[in-house]
Amino acid sequence: MTMKTLCLSLIVIGVLILVAVKAEDYVNINSLEEAPEENVNINNLEETPEESRCIQRHRSCRKSSECCGCSVCQCNLFGQNCQCKSGGLIACGKK
């Protein structure tokens, strides 16, 4: 293989891995039965089964451990308006 082919192959593999990681955040089997509310009440999470105790992306949160998958809880400069957002490949697995 030439260097150009090798580099192109590595880029394609990297993109495929990134797409697979991002798809994990969008697919939540528990969410197929019932759509989540716009503003999630943290107290109501305790009444649900263990598997669905996470907040999906773009929903309000208070800490990163509440967010599903590789999402992290990000707030604005003043520590308000916190939402679960994609943490990227680096944040995946860290809570």
Curated annotation (Swiss-Prot):
GO cellular component labels: extracellular region
Keywords tagged on the record: Amidation, Disulfide bond, Secreted, Signal
Subcellular location(s) per record: Secreted
Signal peptide: 1-23
InterPro entries per UniProt: Agouti_dom_sf (IPR036836)
GO molecular function: signaling receptor binding
Disulfide bonds: 54-68, 61-73, 67-84, 70-92, 75-82
Tissues expressed in: Expressed by the venom gland.
Modified residues (Cysteine amide): 92
Described function: This recombinant (non-amidated) toxin shows insecticidal activity on larvae of the housefly Musca domestica and has no activity on a panel of expressed neuronal receptors and ion channels.
More about this protein: Negative results: does not show effect on transient receptor potential cation channels (rTRPV1, mTRPV2, hTRPV3, and rTRPA1). Does not show effect and insect and arachnid sodium channels (BgNav, DmNav, and VdNav), as well as on mammals sodium channels (Nav1.4/SCN4A, Nav1.6/SCN8A, and Nav1.7/SCN9A). Does not show effect on insect and mammal potassium channels (Shaker, Kv1.1/KCNA1, Kv1.2/KCNA2, Kv1.3/KCNA3, Kv1.4/KCNA4, Kv1.5/KCNA5, Kv1.6/KCNA8, Kv2.1/KCNB1, Kv3.1/KCNC1, Kv4.3/KCND3, and Kv10.1/KCNH1), and on calcium channels Cav3.1/CACNA1G.
Domain notes per entry: The presence of a 'disulfide through disulfide knot' structurally defines this protein as a knottin.
UniProt similarity note: Belongs to the neurotoxin 02 (plectoxin) family. 02 (plectoxin) subfamily.
Protein name per Swiss-Prot or TrEMBL: Toxin Tbo-IT2
Classification lineage: Eukaryota, Metazoa, Ecdysozoa, Arthropoda, Chelicerata
